[in-house]
Amino acid sequence: PRVLIDVMTELIKPQLGDKCFDPACGTFGFMIAANRYVNAHNDMYALSDRQADFQQNKAFNGVELVHETHRLALMNAYLHNMNANITLGDSLAQSAKGLKDFDVILTNPPFGTKKGGERATRDDISFQTSNKQLNFLQVIYRSLKADGKARCAVVLPDNVLFAAGDGASVRRELMNFCNLHTILRLPTGIFYAQGVKTNVLFFTRGTTEQDNTTEVAFYDMRTNMDSFGKTRQLRKSDFDEFVAGYEDPSKRTGERWSRFTREEIAKNPDDSLDLGLIRDDSIVDYDDLPDPVESGEEAIANLEEAVDLLKSVVRELRALTEEK
């Protein structure tokens, strides 16, 4: 939703002269929000010719894989008076290897596996997995400028926080390369299909590639929250408590805020970051759920029974009509 894009952008605070990037840009929404933020916080008429040229032609960049969506991104940028660099291609492919040294990355990578399980072809990431989000995460933190200031906000599903194997390796590398300082646990059903659980990871690239994360703050916007959807849409005011604590750690009061040191995280199996959720006894444990195959077959049987019943009703109505 637009409100989440705006909140992420306002917390990352893109500045004049920042080179911004979205490696899975869709229709370019994040970069348009970044451009809007820069314009709102600066006197654009006071820029030098060099500054104006950079903002117009070099500041905002993106990559989009789908041809039709790429065309929409170009059109969207044009309508917002942005001569942006939007590449038609795959950020996980070798051809995108040169897209590096960005000051700001704002993105929402697609879910799923890479081409039905094919691994990323870039040779500059450490762990080439079939998990698209883990590959994108590696591309993202390796695409940030290693100056201690380059920063990112990225939407990722829960599995990135706890996946074993390469998932654990990617999390360790992320926390080594970057200061992963904040994780926002989002409500279900606001960004994707109902039931998909997502998070926003906020991190800053370090100047080194070792021990940059010392502590991670978590904010639980998921447990005991309203059910968001068509009848109750997400509002900017829903983020007020999170934004206040993000910008001023002294305001991180209340049960929704928690923090864990790197040493505490290391004690979790696979360096899991699946932390920071308030205990909610109303939530059913996954282990207690019925077998999904059996549940699916039962649902099919119930639907077939309902269809048969509906058919019989139609037959009876037709017979009554014919009698008249």
Task: State the predicted function of each range.
Residues 1-107, 112-114, 123, 130, ...:
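Conserved S-adenosyl-L-methionine
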Residues 99-324:
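A conserved structural/catalytic subdomain of Rossmann-like adenosyl-cofactor enzymes
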